[in-house]
């Protein structure tokens, strides 16, 4: 039996319902300071120095200036019932993602995991922004506040709250997703597009 495609009116209705759930936060970011400036502040205060070291680690501020401060390495769809890994390597050819698609079974619970590194300076107010399109119509926009992070050798991981994949005949089909990783300074650390296909079963 052929899948029933949603009409333009139904897509507009979905977009309107999702728009009602969007909230803008009136937030003014603090003035940015470099790691070196933070380490120099109150450097004679031993307890404060130890606190900063615990917070920031022993940071080498002379990191290669040619390497981006923030590198987003992977996007993973975390789903306990998935038959295999659902992962995008964001250090490679981003254009290739437009030609492939994740398959997600309708109604399953999943989370999005973003893996990233911070190399030199503290980054304040990082956000993961996701716009979802169906047949060229934007039906959803979600902003996730990732937070502020300092440099370290190990990768950080950010997990979105648990979500449920859409379900039902009208929900099945292909979705185009435009993702962006940004911060308080509106620096575009990485933007990429990827595709998601909602199916009745993992493989049908």
Swiss-Prot record:
Disruption phenotype: From 1 week to 12 weeks of age, progressive deterioration from mild to massive albuminuria as consequence of renal abnormalities. In kidney, severe podocyte damage, glomerular lesions with focal and segmental sclerosis, along with prominent intratubular casts and luminal dilatation. Tubular epithelial cells show degenerative changes with basement membrane thickening. Increase of apoptotic cells in kidney glomeruli and tubulointerstitium. Keywords: Acetylation, Cytoplasm, GTPase activation, Isopeptide bond, Phosphoprotein, Ubl conjugation. GO terms for molecular function: GTPase activator activity; Rho GDP-dissociation inhibitor activity. GO terms for biological process: regulation of protein localization; regulation of Rho protein signal transduction; regulation of synaptic vesicle cycle; Rho protein signal transduction; semaphorin-plexin signaling pathway. Disulfide bonds: none annotated. Signal peptide: none annotated. The modification N-acetylalanine is found at residue 2. The modification N6-succinyllysine is found at residue 141. In kidney glomerulus, expressed in podocytes and mesangial cells. There is a cross-link at residues 138, 141 (Glycyl lysine isopeptide (Lys-Gly) (interchain with G-Cter in SUMO1)). There is a cross-link at residues 138, 141 (Glycyl lysine isopeptide (Lys-Gly) (interchain with G-Cter in SUMO2)). One of its GO terms (cellular component) is Schaffer collateral - CA1 synapse. It is found in: Cytoplasm. Gene3D superfamilies: Coagulation Factor XIII, subunit A, domain 1. Controls Rho proteins homeostasis. Regulates the GDP/GTP exchange reaction of the Rho proteins by inhibiting the dissociation of GDP from them, and the subsequent binding of GTP to them. Retains Rho proteins such as CDC42, RAC1 and RHOA in an inactive cytosolic pool, regulating their stability and protecting them from degradation. Actively involved in the recycling and distribution of activated Rho GTPases in the cell, mediates extraction from membranes of both inactive and activated molecules due its exceptionally high affinity for prenylated forms. Monomer. Interacts with FER. Interacts with PLXNB3. Forms a heterodimer with RAC1. Interacts with RHOA, the affinity is increased by three orders of magnitude when RHOA is prenylated. Interacts with PSMD10; the interaction increases ARHGDIA association with RHOA, leading to ARHGDIA-mediated inactivation of RHOA and ROCK and prolonged AKT activation. Interacts with KANK2; the interaction is direct and may regulate the interaction of ARHGDIA with RHOA, RAC1 and CDC42. Interacts with RHOC. Interacts with CDC42. Interacts with NGFR (via death domain); NGFR binding decreases the affinity for RHOA. This is Rho GDP-dissociation inhibitor 1. It comes from Mus musculus.
